[in-house]
Amino acid sequence: MERVIINKEKLRKEEIDKTKIKTRVILLNEKNEIILCNYNGCYLLIGGKVEKQETIKEALLREIKEEIGVVLDHNDIKEFILIEHYQKNYPTENNTIKNNLLITYYFISKKKVKIKYDKITLSESEKKHNFKLIQASPTEIMQLLENNNTLNPRAVYYKEELEEIIKRLKIK
């Protein structure tokens, strides 16, 4: 798996307050558009955090089922890229500032999927923060990122990761 390090502020490991592990997936629909979401003003690929009892793939398959209502199998997804993102002065939900290391395992689905809106089970946080699914081409996603004027300061971090992913995709 290709490994990319984003560390614009040159943080050292000993400066990190918290390390988080997440997993996300590049899912394509029948039109070759990428399925992503807007959550609290941030554009993200489908996925989320890895719970203590889960493997990375198990967490991803659970998140796919919850967020788009589709059941995939371990064999339907393959490794794409690992991003280690050092985040200086990251604003937390309780209004404190932390230096984070976000390690995100990105996968790509070998299967085209269709969102099953009637099977989606969002968390209370996702409902509260206006979780919304979007289907767009890589070019359209880059425009969404460029024109995103959210007040959520975390959006810049997600934008950096999504740009790294889009650069590596072989679709327009």
Residue ranges of model-derived segments:
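Acidic, metal-coordinating catalytic segment for phosphate/diphosphate chemistry
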Residues: M1-R24, L28-E30
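Short loop segments at secondary-structure junctions
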Residues: N29-N32, K110-I115, P138-T139
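Nudix hydrolase/Nudix homology domain
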Residues: Y43, I115-K172
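A structural signal for short, well-ordered beta-strand segments
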Residues: V25, E79, Y105-S109
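A short coil-to-beta-strand element that immediately follows conserved catalytic motifs
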Residues: V71-I83
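Active-site-adjacent beta-strand/loop module that shapes the phosphate/pyrophosphate-binding cleft
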Residues: H85-I120, I134
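Conserved Nudix-box catalytic region and its N-terminal flanking loop in Nudix hydrolases
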Residues: N29-E67, V71
